[in-house]
């Protein structure tokens, strides 16, 4: 299952993750976000979303290790992936049909949100389900 990880770019941005290569994704206080974090597994894909400043999906990451032995403080290590060729701003995400009814908008303050495969594809490649698309992918390789 893919996930959306929200971060405040003035505190820790996608560029910081790229510079560091890997980081522990921590500082989560919300119980529902912690439950979602505990479900993550090694190898799962993530989209990094800048909240507060910029408000856009900006890049990808991958879970490289997970330790949920302490239920109150799961340790998830992520590795930087690729920057999206084109950031996906909040207004565009909100307008996308693939996000209708998403927990991302029902509980906007959650910092860890599960995504469907269709949502991940839309964020990283611009693909709507069953839609034809011309042009290059949004994910730079």
Residue ranges and their predicted role:
Residues 6-7, 50, 80:
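Pocket-edge structural micro-motifs
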Residues 10-12, 85, 120-122:
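Short, acidic Gly/Pro/Ser/Thr-rich loop/turn segments
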Residues 58-117:
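Aromatic- and Lys/Arg-enriched surface recognition patch
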Residues 49-55:
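Short, charged beta-turn/beta-strand-edge "cap" motif at the junction between a beta-strand
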Residues 16, 87-93, 123-126:
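Short, charged, solvent-exposed linker or helix-capping segments at domain edges/interfaces
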Residues 1-42, 130, 138-141:
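Compositionally biased, charged N-terminal/linker segments
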């Amino acid at each position: 299952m893919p996930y959306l990880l929200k971060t405040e770019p003035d505190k820790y941005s996608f560029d910081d993750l790229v510079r560091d290569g890997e980081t522990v994704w921590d500082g989560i206080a919300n119980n529902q976000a912690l439950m979602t974090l505990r479900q993550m597994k090694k190898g799962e894909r993530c989209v990094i979303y800048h909240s507060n400043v910029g408000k856009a999906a900006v890049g990808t990451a991958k879970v490289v290790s997970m330790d949920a032995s302490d239920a109150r403080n799961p340790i998830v290590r992520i590795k930087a992936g690729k920057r999206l060729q084109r950031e996906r701003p909040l207004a565009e995400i909100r307008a996308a049909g693939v996000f209708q009814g998403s927990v991302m908008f029902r509980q906007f303050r959650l910092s860890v949100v599960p995504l469907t495969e269709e949502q991940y594809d839309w964020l990283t490649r611009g693909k709507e389900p069953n839609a034809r698309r011309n042009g290059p992918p949004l994910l730079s390789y």
